[in-house]
Curated annotation (Swiss-Prot):
Cofactor binding note of this UniProt entry: Binds 1 Mn(2+) ion per subunit.
NCBIfam families (UniProt xref): PRK02929.1
Species for this entry: Salmonella paratyphi B (strain ATCC BAA-1250 / SPB7)
Example GO biological process: L-arabinose catabolic process to xylulose 5-phosphate
Reactions catalysed, as given in the entry: beta-L-arabinopyranose = L-ribulose
UniProt keyword Hydrolase present: no
Gene Ontology annotations for the cellular component aspect, listed alphabetically: cytosol
Co-factor requirement: Mn(2+)
The organism's taxonomic lineage, starting at the top: Bacteria, Pseudomonadati, Pseudomonadota, Gammaproteobacteria, Enterobacterales
Pfam family membership, one: Arabinose_Iso_C
The protein's name in its UniProt record: L-arabinose isomerase
Originating gene: araA
Domain of life: Bacteria
Pathway(s) where this gene product acts: Carbohydrate degradation; L-arabinose degradation via L-ribulose; D-xylulose 5-phosphate from L-arabinose (bacterial route): step 1/3
Amino acid sequence: MTIFDNYEVWFVIGSQHLYGAETLRQVTQHAEHVVNALNTEAKLPCKLVLKPLGTSPDEITAICRDANYDDRCAGLVVWLHTFSPAKMWINGLSILNKPLLQFHTQFNAALPWDSIDMDFMNLNQTAHGGREFGFIGARMRQQHAVVTGHWQDKEAHTRIGAWMRQAVSKQDTRQLKVCRFGDNMREVAVTDGDKVAAQIKFGFSVNTWAVGDLVQVVNSIGDGDINALIDEYESSYTLTPATRIHGDKRQNVREAARIELGMKRFLEQGGFHAFTTTFEDLHGLKQLPGLAVQRLMQQGYGFAGEGDWKTAALLRIMKVMSTGLQGGTSFMEDYTYHFEKGNDLVLGSHMLEVCPSIAVEEKPILDVQHLGIGGKEDPARLIFNTQTGPAIVASLIDLGDRYRLLVNCIDTVKTPHSLPKLPVANALWKAQPDLPTASEAWILAGGAHHTVFSHALDLNDMRQFAEIHDIEIAVIDNDTRLPAFKDALRWNEVYYGLKR
């Protein structure tokens, strides 16, 4: 069972009584056929639920009102099978607070050249019914998605499925609770921000709990639970000699297991699905949570270090969006560069906390090594390299008057040399279009040093995320040129200033 099983998307057909009972009967019949086929064959993440025809203002408004108050409804897919005068939709759309997609399709794929008549034309009017619906959306300044294509087309299926992921993610975000264990890293700017504005814009709440509250739960964990979790470590990872039974760091592994169990219990009891820690606020914990955080991220929790609640929330959101897709999603940080003409590289990592969902297939190494930052006992961590291939890194920043999402398309590459003295998980990539352009654009746009790294999602997913939340997006990819990028930032400043 996944998070998508908790939601459904309503399929709404727009028409009108002008065409008579027989036409409306055929519209209903077609709608039932399409919905059944999509649910059976399209591999959509959510179930489509067909609602009664929308043929009058009252019917349409009732559907929109019901959608708002049904917690299982993640959004609406609207098909204008016939012409549906858009003034009928104004009241409903004005109150609708769920994501909306127009599926611009028709029942038949090919025109029946020899038999087409006006009855056929009146029944199959998506071509201009969809335009009428589009006008009222533009007139009302209502953000909605449009997918054009025949309902049997696999590309249309893929695009609807991707939108469904966004719709479910938005509903989950409205319920998301982010727990900050301690505060932000002292004097750091980008990890701070307006938590009230974030809740107004996205819906997630951010609050702080004292590390002592967590420590109390951690200390309540019994040896039996710890032993069971250690057995799981033994079967899932390759343990270094120091971390095995009778190894000199075995107790550190047990303490890491205690912290993991305590953190998970605390998060479950509080209904949290994202959290932060900071190495400056660990009072009562024997080690910086490394292994615990890595494993919790792999289970779907959002996380970021140094109190960075925006990145923690974004990671959770992107974890939900990518549920069931191939490839992983992780907290990440641009750490250091390899400058080589024509082969500039970025080595990404963090002190400990990189999610194993992005790891290569072989078992990660479980090790305990010294960590100078934090002043605690040596922490346990998983060490691995990352899968290769196309990926993205994304950052959500608070500009005071608005939020900006930055996305850099990257190409993850194999590490050309072993890293015997680097005791942390890492990813190596080439930034698009090149490191100088990507880094300068990122810096000029104010992108954070913390990011969410994903093999599972792509630029189109993040564009949809920005659209569905009505926030600015700045894209850095192979098409980026710095003069045009700077111009876009200036234009956005004017646009969002006027929009306020």
